[in-house]
Amino acid sequence: MINKSYKHWMIVFFMCCLAASSIGLCTNAIGVFYTPVAKSLKVLKGTFAMHATLSTLATALTLLKISKVIKKYSYKKVLLIGVILSSGATWLMSYSTSVYLFYILGILRGIGVGIYGMVPITVVITNWFDKKHGLATSLALSFSGLSGAIFSPLLSSWITCYGWQMTYRFMAICILVLVLPALIVPWNIDPRKEHLLPYGYQNRKETTKVQNNKIKLLTISFLCMCLFTLLHTSITGISQHLSGVAVSIHLSVTIGATFMSFTMIGNISTKLLIGFLSDLLSPIKAVIMMILTNCF
């Protein structure tokens, strides 16, 4: 079986599209709606932004189970359900007149994002890549930042020209279109089912022996990792509010969207750099280097 082919990089392209749709559009770019929709519904921005919090919570709960689901069922069918939920919920938001309806639709969109977001993307790349795994992962996930950088000012401009209702419909169409390549082109989550091996895979003797099938979660290292993940992920939510911050200091919504684009550009460059360093050194060393860089 072949361990290097164009199909491996086609899979990366599909994952780029999924990241752009699920994380880029549904997570990184939604902040441009906070001010205009909250004003239209006559509620506080924080009250409206709660729908994004509920969406993220729904995504987190979905991610806990999705790895088992994609092993049991055809991922293309699962992917179709995910994109219908995310794009459909976004489309229905354009007709919403109550903040509570936004909460419900936000949860549905969050479930959809979880179905084809971060975990499925990394699972697919892990299955398809042995060597250059870090590069493939960072390349795919960087498109979440690229999508956010492109669509934040674009959505802001559409809101100004067409209103937030029509912009939600445009956004729903974009969410669906980005996923279409992965839905239309035949591919499998396991390369061996296509008579291929993971990229760069070589037969090697297994030297690691499993001592115990039980995994201990209540360890200091695991708890520290949970705390680190919580703290570093909480920072990403700030970018969604930059548009509202810009308006509060008498700048235009477009300027706020530009601020969001700059954060996404940093997102892209960091993911590409950490992917390169992971392959060159190791994932742990790469993360430590990036943390030290951020400290300065």
List each model region and its residues.
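Hydrophobic core of transmembrane alpha-helices in multi-pass small-molecule transporters
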Residues: 20, 89, 100-116, 230
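Extracytoplasmic gate region of multi-pass secondary transporters
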Residues: 27-34, 217-274
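Helix-to-loop junctions at the C-terminal end of transmembrane segments
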Residues: 62-74, 270-282
